A protein has these predicted regions:
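A conserved SF2-helicase RecA2
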Residues: 363-421
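SF2 helicase motor core recognition
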Residues: 69-72, 124-126, 292-296, 322, ...
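Conserved helix/coil segment N-terminal to the catalytic DExD/H
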Residues: 42-60, 65-81, 95
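Conserved Walker A/P-loop ATP-binding site and its immediately adjacent core
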Residues: 3-25, 123-128, 287-289
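Conserved Helicase C-terminal RecA-like lobe
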Residues: 1-11, 77, 190-212, 222-348, ...
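Conserved helicase motor
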Residues: 35-44, 65-70, 94-97, 286-290, ...
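Conserved P-loop NTPase motor "coupling/switch" region that bridges the ATPase
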Residues: 6-7, 25, 32-33, 41, ...
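Conserved nucleic-acid-binding Ia/Ib motif block in the N-terminal RecA-like helicase ATPase lobe
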Residues: 10-55, 59-60, 309
Length: 421
């Protein structure tokens, strides 16, 4: 730590809030870690706050990729003058001429130490590695993307501008591995069979204002409505949970209105990383039918044409459900399973995937516990990963805390209902 006093971490927006929590849990030395989220003013204030970080503390700034190249932010990050720059999920800078990639190259050139972290640094295109290594160590593959492409890619197609194949991949891999450390889940013997990860989602300002209004109105109604029952509290929490997922059910309306895509955008990143480019299968659980429908529409847009998604929810006939599960388990082209947690969370086997995303959960611990076992059961040969999409400072966090305590909200919510709002 004597040589590294200031660290800059660049990560996907949903991962940025995880970094301070990880430092708190695992660092055995003093750390001040600030997340650079929110408005431009807030981000600049947080960067400025780190300038006064005590010399005996490691100072860490964590920012999302989409912000790093913005006017004002980029210059402030340069002034921060990090000793170590970390690219978390470094495949986000695989496109050599993207603004965020170019910004990262410049920040990397200023830093003494650099680190990239990725489960899939090379996805569908071996050429993806150049931009990441241009940041990490420009001496490995050189400064010229086009020279690199000429060395390892076979060009063809219209005007000879399309990559139609690759050459000397053994040489490319040898150079890549010369400064890389790779370990699989199977090789990580100290890794638990089940790993849990939280991805935090920011609520847009307009929806946050609406959320706060509904939250305050709910508290007022409960305080002035006489006897508080579990049913009345859960009904109001349900509405807040729907809003956290991006949907609002207006009074008297038959159908919910989509008011935000923040959670869907976070899920989109995961599907692209794990399925589209990682070549893996994925299970997604959601509580509400409109969420399931929205996820299916998202999948239709981003999955390759020869890849499919299936869904299992309450409206599916029971005699059709086995076929849907079987298709996901056996068909290599069926790569995404979207399940309504109350319907698909019990009694089925989904071991074709080793990763499960929770878009939303219900209030029942038993249902949640059962859903964990859909991918973690006999027939699973890999360690399992569970990713929670959580809107910060919302009912999502309260539900997560209750479920981690193995509580059923329907049984505990009456005694201290205000804590859930």
């Amino acid at each position: 730590m004597g040589e590294v006093k200031r660290v800059l971490v660049i990560a996907p927006a949903s991962v940025v809030p995880v970094w301070p929590k990880e430092f708190d849990e695992y660092a055995d030395f003093p750390v001040m870690c600030k997340t650079l989220l929110g408005s431009k003013k807030q981000r600049l204030e947080n960067i400025s706050g780190l300038k006064g970080c005590h010399n005996k503390k490691l100072c860490v700034a964590a920012v999302n990729y989409e912000s790093v190249w913005r006017d004002g932010i980029f210059e402030a990050l340069q002034d921060y003058d990090a000793d170590l720059v970390v690219c978390d999920e470094s495949q986000r800078i695989k496109t050599h001429d993207a603004k965020q990639s170019k910004a990262m190259h410049q920040l990397g050139d200023m830093a003494r130490y650099k680190l990239i972290l990725s489960g899939t640094p090379v996805q569908n295109n071996a050429i993806d590695i150049w931009s990441q290594y241009r940041f990490l160590d420009r001496t490995v593959f050189g400064d010229s993307y086009y020279a690199f492409r000429g060395r390892y890619a076979v060009m063809g197609g219209f005007n000879n501008k399309q990559i139609v194949g690759y050459k000397d991949l053994d040489g490319l891999i040898k150079k890549e591995h010369s400064i890389a450390f790779r370990i699989t889940k199977e090789e990580a013997v100290d890794l638990p069979e089940q790993t849990f990860e939280v991805r935090y989602v920011g609520m847009p300002a307009k929806e946050r204002k609406l959320y706060e209004k509904i939250r305050k109105d709910s508290i007022t109604e409960l305080e002035s409505g006489g006897k508080v029952t579990a049913a009345t509290v859960l009904t109001k929490l349900l509405r807040l949970q729907q809003l956290a997922g991006g949907f609002l059910v207006k009074d008297g309306a038959d159908k919910p209105e989509k008011v935000s895509t923040a959670k869907l955008d976070a899920l989109k990143d995961i599907i692209i990383d794990y399925v589209v480019e990682g070549g893996r299968k994925l299970v997604v659980f959601a509580r509400f039918i409109p969420e399931v429908d929205a996820i299916l529409k998202l999948a239709e847009k981003i999955l390759p044409k020869n890849r499919k998604a299936v869904a299992l929810y309450g409206g599916i006939k029971k005699n059709e459900r086995g076929g849907i599960v079987g298709q996901f388990q056996t068909d290599p082209d069926t790569v995404l399973f979207v399940g309504q947690i109350d319907t698909a969370g019990t009694g089925i086997t989904l071991t074709a995937a080793d990763t499960c995303v929770y878009y939303s959960k219900n209030f029942n611990y038993a249902t949640y516990e059962q859903s964990l076992s859909r991918i973690h059961r006999i027939g699973q040969v890999n360690r399992c990963t569970y990713i929670d999409l959580v809107v910060g400072d919302s009912v999502d966090e309260k539900i997560n805390i209750a479920l981690m305590k193995k509580e059923n909200l329907a049984e505990t919510v009456v005694d201290n209902w205000k804590q859930y709002f």
